[in-house]
Amino acid sequence: MSQADRPAVVARDISKSFGPFVAVDRVSFAVEHGEIFGFLGSNGAGKTTTIRMLCGLLAPTSGTATVLGFDVAREAGEIKRRIGYMSQRFSLYSDLTVEENLRFWGGTYGLFGQRLADRLAWAIATAELAGERRVLVRELPGGFRQRLALVAALIHEPPIVFLDEPTGGVDPEARRRFWDLIDALAGSGTTVFVTTHSMDEAERCHRVALMHAGRLLALDSVPALKRIFPPGTVVEVACSRPAQAVAAIERLPGIEEVALFGERLRVVLASPADGAGIAARIREAGCADAVIAPVEPSLEDVFIHVIAEAEGAAAR
């Protein structure tokens, strides 16, 4: 089987321990070529440790993984030469200009002459930095620096790029423009492996792995993940006394989860028929203005649900 026929990334039961602490616990998955693969989880879920193992920066304690057909433990050097990597920490030189940084990173990957000039032109155009090419990096706004870091990681045209929480600390518009770049990359065939704790960003991935406490709890496309809830089992309650409404219904039979978001409640039912009981109890609690309506499950609903199930199973 040629490399083009194999997944871009294959992980089989990879684990990483630091002394007694297990940061990643027997995680398995595969990433296809040209896919935007999201690794979703809160801080401490094991996302960065996993990405560092795949980039050849950390050896797994156990299990195996390959990237572009190369083993992460035995062939880390081959992997590093062939991938792009954007770490959580900004890794460019703040006392160099935009162009100087790109020339430096191009040189580290063996680019020179016309090839370097072509890639430099591509990077500046793609990141929309033509007017900033001679500006010191430390003077750039956060969104500009993030786009620069991305194209620097892609200067050598790697077939796969690893992005670790790439939009941390930037405003929503900068985040949207950054993700437009990611979409364009995947459209041109580049594989994108991205870690995030943002539900909105995860929604833009082709498939999402849900990580919690070092373990992979679920993996599928976003629409498929949302289908874990039967139709009509996720409802939203709007009322003037949301705290009273929560107290009134959270112990009702048939209520699996209740979460308060501002003046609205998000409720997961065991079955759609349980919704009638909610309406009656809320009104008995003095919330006569309550409006209850079924809504499409969100990725956050899924994440909360699978974590609750995993923690419940661990407690049994």
For the regions a language model picked out, list residue spans one by one.
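Conserved protein kinase catalytic domain
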Residues: 80, 124, 226, 300-304
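Short phosphate-engaging motifs
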Residues: 63, 75, 201, 244-245, ...
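C-terminal coupling/interaction segments
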Residues: 3, 269-316
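ABC transporter nucleotide-binding domain
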Residues: 180-270, 293
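A generic structural signal for secondary-structure junctions
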Residues: 84, 110, 230-231, 254, ...
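ABC transporter nucleotide-binding domains
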Residues: 6-11, 16-211, 218
